From Swiss-Prot:
Intracellular or extracellular location(s): Membrane
One Gene Ontology term, aspect cellular component: membrane
Keyword flag Signal: no
Family: Belongs to the BI1 family.
Membrane topology: Multi-pass membrane protein
InterPro entries: Bax_inhibitor_1-related (IPR006214)
Keywords, in A-Z order: Membrane, Transmembrane, Transmembrane helix
Membrane-spanning ranges: 42-62, 75-95, 105-125, 130-150, 165-185, 188-208, 222-242
Protein name in the entry: Protein LIFEGUARD 4
Residues spanning the signal sequence: none
Amino acid sequence: MYKWNLPYRKDDVETGREGGERSLYPTMLESPELRWGFIRKVYSIIAFQLLATIAVASTVVFVRPIAVFFATTSAGLALWIVLIITPLIVMCPLYYYHQKHPVNYLLLGIFTVALAFAVGLTCAFTSGKVILEAAILTTVVVLSLTVYTFWAAKKGYDFNFLGPFLFGALIVLMVFALIQIFFPLGRISVMIYGCLAAIIFCGYIVYDTDNLIKRYSYDEYIWAAVSLYLDIINLFLALLTIFRAAE
């Protein structure tokens, strides 16, 4: 279609694109409109995941018999272990089928609900003040880092180099957690663990947002959503750990 048939379109001299399409980053070759559509889809999925997590976790927190069942019975303990392991197990087929509809959505639902139960059980034995503080700070941090990453990408910065460092830091964090389980070191060590976890997952939010802008293919919307959802949930749990230890 000729340009004169679309009077509302205007060449963007700065980016060299027609219709005023603005690139998300300087070396962008794909259509910004398609990439923005992909980004909106991923954030829509994350929003539904977070809403489901809030709904399930709130049910666990406010319906006290649920928390009591998990905390005081052997069956509840066994079910709690199953719920902790389920997200890890489901991630394997979810990664394999993340491009196959509707299996990917089914697995995503199972993954989200199981993780939401684990979050709910953590919150059930935490004061409301601490939960609110962690939730507010998580929201502020996630929004700030997301805006910063989009701005940095626009300016030409790239965060792909963070991948190996974050993975190494995550391994250290997991070893620290195992040590803490078998050899509890007290409140100070718990706060140190929470601070390290918060820093690491802040880095992962920047790293995964950068991948969302530049690297994920359009068929990888499920895996992109899972990555950022895990970053947000883990950041919340890390902040919850810090505030609980400081309370």
